[in-house]
């Protein structure tokens, strides 16, 4: 009762293809891949130490 047979997976696949169409699925997978790449890039950027930035500014003198 708890496991899904091959026929269940086939029916799910047909429903997904009908809902999204053949062209939409590769587009969605590309978006997922871009998200994973940006997540990995964010994780590696987090590990790099940031250098301290100093801002030199002159105080306004009022008379």
Swiss-Prot record:
GO terms for molecular function: protein transmembrane transporter activity. The chain crosses the membrane at residues 1-21. One of its GO terms (biological process) is protein transport by the Tat complex. It comes from the Bacteria. It is a single-pass membrane protein. It is found in: Cell inner membrane. Keywords: Cell inner membrane, Cell membrane, Membrane, Protein transport, Translocation, Transmembrane, Transmembrane helix, Transport. GO terms for cellular component: TAT protein transport complex. Residues 43-63 are annotated as: Disordered. The keyword Transit peptide does not apply. Residues 53-63 have a biased composition (Basic and acidic residues). Its main location: membrane. The keyword Transmembrane helix applies. Belongs to the TatA/E family. The Tat system comprises two distinct complexes: a TatABC complex, containing multiple copies of TatA, TatB and TatC subunits, and a separate TatA complex, containing only TatA subunits. Substrates initially bind to the TatABC complex, which probably triggers association of the separate TatA complex to form the active translocon. Part of the twin-arginine translocation (Tat) system that transports large folded proteins containing a characteristic twin-arginine motif in their signal peptide across membranes. TatA could form the protein-conducting channel of the Tat system. This is Sec-independent protein translocase protein TatA. It comes from Rhizobium etli (strain ATCC 51251 / DSM 11541 / JCM 21823 / NBRC 15573 / CFN 42).
